[in-house]
Regions:
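Polytopic transmembrane helical bundles with strong interfacial aromatic enrichment
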Residues: 1-174
């Protein structure tokens, strides 16, 4: 039961990370239409909240799976391990994105905060166990996947706003 809960929380964490970090990457690189700024800010805010909640819940679930003892070994396994480092990066990056300024003059700061969130994949999971190179590849892979994920939301929003004639001109079925 706890394994299923941990998998669900991990999936929610991934959705949150793809949303919040990807929206920042898309906003910085795509020059989206002015109408799409609302969807990007929603993706950032909701993704940040989901990332923070899922990261904390995942840490709590891991604590319970390890026996829920408040001893040094259990707390070290949760907070002083690669899992704890990844959780700190996720919460710090998402918190800075959520509570930081979000105008055009702070774009570089937003990018660095989003990179903090995706850098957590270099410290946790199979890639971290394989070494530094695999961790960097995982970090880049997740960053690009997040950009792609949010870029599709921007494209979907732009197509919905353009109307059926503009979408029909692209050749996509409506």
């Amino acid at each position: 039961m706890l394994d299923a809960l941990a998998a669900l929380l991990k999936a929610l964490l991934y959705v949150g990370i793809l949303s919040c970090a990807g929206a920042v990457f898309a906003q910085a690189t795509l020059r989206p239409p002015f109408d799409s700024s609302h969807i990007l800010s929603q993706l950032i805010r909701r993704g940040c909240v989901l990332t923070i909640c899922a990261a904390l819940a995942s840490a709590g679930c891991l604590f319970i799976r390890l026996g829920a003892e408040f001893d040094i070994a259990t707390l070290s396994a949760v907070f002083l391990s690669n899992t704890g480092a990844a959780m700190c990066l996720q919460i710090a990056g998402a918190g800075l994105l959520l509570f930081g300024a979000s105008d055009a003059s702070t774009r570089a700061t937003q990018l660095s905060n989003a990179l903090l969130v995706t850098a957590s994949f270099a410290f946790n999971g199979h890639a971290a166990a394989d070494g530094l190179t695999a961790g960097i590849v995982a970090f880049l892979h997740v960053s690009l996947a997040a950009w792609w994920f949010s870029s599709l939301w921007v494209l979907r929003d732009a197509c919905a706003r353009a109307g059926s004639t503009a979408v029909a001109a692209t050749g996509w079925p409506s």
